[in-house]
Swiss-Prot record:
Assembly behavior: The 4 large subunits of the cytochrome b6-f complex are cytochrome b6, subunit IV (17 kDa polypeptide, PetD), cytochrome f and the Rieske protein, while the 4 small subunits are PetG, PetL, PetM and PetN. The complex functions as a dimer.
Name of the molecule in the record: Cytochrome b6-f complex subunit 8
Primary subcellular site in the record, as a coarse category: plastid
Species this chain originates from: Porphyra purpurea (Red seaweed)
NCBIfam families: PRK14747.1
Entry's family note: Belongs to the PetN family.
Length: 29
């Protein structure tokens, strides 16, 4: 795995995590 793929995977993980935080926040979690 090269650095570009690793960086892209990390970016996608952070994006998904931030969306999960927003959803949980709106649900009162």
């Amino acid at each position: 795995m090269d650095i570009l793929s690793l960086g892209w995977a990390a970016l996608m993980a952070m994006f998904t995590f931030s969306i999960a935080m927003v959803v949980w926040g709106r649900n009162g979690f």
